[in-house]
C-alpha cells in the first residue's frame, strides 16, 4: 500500500490515540506512513506523542510521527482525518451533569445519553466540527474524514444537512 498521512485531531486523549496508534503500528500495509498528532493542549499532546513514539519503536513499526498544535498544519496533505476532539473535556461534561442534577434531570442510567447534552456539549462540538470540515474542504478535500468524537450521530446528521 502507498504511504499515507493520517491526521489525528484531538490527539491529546491517551485513550483514543494510544488505541489508534496500536492498530496503526500493527498494520504492515501502513509502513512508512505519517501520523500527525494535533491537539490544542500542548502538555497532553506531548505526553501522548511520547507514549505513541515509544510504542512504535518497541513494535518496530515504520511509522513517521509528528505533533503540532496547529490544525491546518496537521491537515496539510492528509489522506485520512480522525477527529477524537472533545471541546469541553471531561470537566465540561461534569459541569453539564451537575447543572442537570441541580435542575432535577435524570440521565436514564447512561451519561452518554444525557438530557442536557444537546444544550451543554453539542453546541461546542458542532462549532468545532464545522470549522474542521471547512478546513478539510480547503486544505485536503480528498481526505477521508472519520468522526470518533461524540456526539457521532448528531454530527453525522449535521454532515448530511450542511455538507
Residues covered by each model-derived region:
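Metallocofactor- and cofactor-centric catalytic cores in central/energy metabolism, strongly enriched
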Residues: 2-97, 110-163
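Short, glycine-/small- and polar/acidic-enriched structural segments
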Residues: 16, 102-103
Amino acid at each position: 500500500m502507498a504511504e499515507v498521512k493520517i491526521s489525528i485531531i484531538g490527539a491529546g486523549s491517551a485513550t483514543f490515540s494510544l488505541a489508534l496508534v496500536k492498530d496503526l503500528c500493527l498494520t504492515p500495509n501502513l509502513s512508512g506512513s505519517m501520523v500527525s498528532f494535533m491537539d490544542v493542549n500542548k502538555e497532553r499532546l506531548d505526553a501522548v506523542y511520547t507514549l505513541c513514539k515509544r510504542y512504535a519503536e518497541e513494535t518496530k513499526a515504520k511509522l513517521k510521527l509528528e505533533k503540532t498544535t496547529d490544525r491546518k498544519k496537521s491537515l496539510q496533505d492528509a489522506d485520512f482525518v480522525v477527529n477524537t476532539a472533545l471541546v469541553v473535556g471531561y470537566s465540561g461534561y461534569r459541569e453539564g451533569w451537575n447543572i442537570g442534577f441541580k435542575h432535577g434531570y435524570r440521565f436514564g442510567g447512561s451519561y452518554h445519553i444525557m438530557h442536557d447534552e444537546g444544550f451543554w456539549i453539542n453546541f461546542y462540538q458542532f462549532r468545532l466540527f464545522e470549522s474542521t470540515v471547512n478546513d478539510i474542504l480547503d486544505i485536503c478535500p480528498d481526505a477521508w474524514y472519520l468522526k470518533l468524537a461524540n456526539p457521532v450521530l448528531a454530527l453525522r446528521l449535521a454532515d448530511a444537512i450542511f455538507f
